[in-house]
């Protein structure tokens, strides 16, 4: 696993061991970031795993990323990857589940330019996260949510509007923005 583009292009990333982890394939990651064109501001990498999506965003110019994963080993891998690339100052890393993390973020009154959702497949975790992101108004007015999920899953987009949807074999990605009725 590696960084695809930007300041840290081709740098290797440590990944998680085990059957329950599923790192984002390079072609999916490249497709996501090519469709975004540019990244900037503040990002949230929820269900971060190895941190590959948030680190890719930092490499491509995002100012800061908050990484969240409930797995202790994942948090250690994220911290190691950030340290290796000297990105610690541009990041915050938390061991927490998505529900509690989103509630804590809401209390900090933070809004994000980009939110990456790449949870374990087929657990309805994206639906729960999108519901809270909408309820807590965590996405900036022109922000984008990037969801990666199994093509077997049906995603409830709540108040968000679909910008683009891509299919990569068994993986689908969805880019969402605030709907017009959220103004």
For each of these PLM feature ranges, what is it?
Residues 1-183:
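Class I S-adenosyl-L-methionine-dependent methyltransferase catalytic core
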């Amino acid at each position: 696993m590696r960084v695809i583009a930007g300041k840290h292009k081709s740098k290797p990333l440590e990944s998680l061991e085990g059957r329950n982890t599923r790192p984002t394939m390079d072609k999916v990651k490249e497709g996501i970031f090519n469709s975004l064109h540019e990244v900037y501001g503040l990002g949230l990498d929820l269900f971060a795993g190895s941190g590959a999506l948030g680190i890719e965003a930092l490499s491509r110019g995002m100012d800061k990323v908050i990484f969240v994963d409930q797995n202790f080993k994942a948090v250690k891998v994220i911290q190691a990857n950030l340290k290796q690339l000297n990105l610690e100052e541009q990041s915050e890393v938390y061991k927490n589940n998505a529900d509690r993390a989103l509630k804590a973020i809401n209390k900090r009154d933070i809004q994000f330019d980009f939110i990456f959702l790449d949870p374990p497949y087929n657990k309805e975790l994206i639906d729960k996260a999108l519901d809270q992101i909408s309820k807590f108004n965590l996405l900036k007015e022109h922000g984008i949510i990037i969801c990666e999920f199994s093509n077997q899953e049906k995603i409830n987009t709540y108040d968000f509007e679909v910008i683009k949807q891509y299919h990569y074999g068994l993986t689908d990605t969805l880019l969402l923005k605030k709907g017009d009725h959220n103004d």
